[in-house]
Amino acid sequence: MAGRVDGVNFAHSTHWEGVIQQADDTYAYYGFKRGRQFIAEATLLHEIQDDKYDFLISSNCLEHLANPLKALCEWRRVIAEEGVAVVVVPSKLATFDHKRPTTEICHLLNDFEKDVGEGDMTHLSEILSLHDRSRDRQAGSFEEFKLRCMENRSNRFMHHHVFDMSLLRDAVTLCGFQVLAEHEAVGNLFVLARKRSEVPLNAAINRGQN
């Protein structure tokens, strides 16, 4: 049983949670227990010190990020040595992304090298063309969906990238984790991984620059 669980969200108000207050006792979990609620980008957890947590859980977040490798490296930073992470992303075949191509790891590496920010709209054209609105009850008409996408910086509905298990495994491994277990269920991909001392991503970037 965890002594304390804290939470992070990207804004003070979201479509999914409503109004969120950053404070020491506003993150509710396991009934009446309370932890600290942080408001921060997944790629910039500047209020959280290194090696702070024994475990980290990310569920259906990574696909919404323009720079997933940057986020994974930041998550690794705040996990203690030998700590673990559980990362969950949707399987593309179970979502409105099923018509889109699976993202390649070289694309994620390129985003990391360029330090792509969360306002990036590189994938907008692909999303407008291939997003299956029949599987997205909140998409509305094409024009309504397009407007929602254009406002992604504030609403974060958009799936920037499309994962399969191979991509998720490679991304987690590159960012300094050892994959301990993989599982697919209920339309989601699950990876359990332990923090390693080495970060292969750094070596990959260095090789690309030489």
Regions found by a protein language model. Give the residues of each.
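Class I SAM-dependent methyltransferase SAM/SAH-binding core
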Residues: M1-L45
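S-adenosyl-L-methionine-dependent methyltransferase catalytic module, highlighting the catalytic core
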Residues: Y29-F32, L69-E74, V84-R207
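Short, flexible active-site loop motifs that bind/organize anionic cofactors or intermediates
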Residues: G35, S58-C61, M158
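A short acidic, Gly/Pro-enriched loop at the edge of an enzyme's catalytic core
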Residues: A40-L56
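Active-site micro-motifs of SAM-dependent methyltransferase domains
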Residues: L44, E63, A94
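Surface-exposed loop/turn positions
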Residues: K52, E82-G83
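A short SAM/SAH-binding and catalytic strip from SAM-dependent methyltransferases
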Residues: D54-A66
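Helix-to-beta-strand junctions that scaffold the AdoMet/dcAdoMet cofactor pocket
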Residues: L65-A66, I79-E81
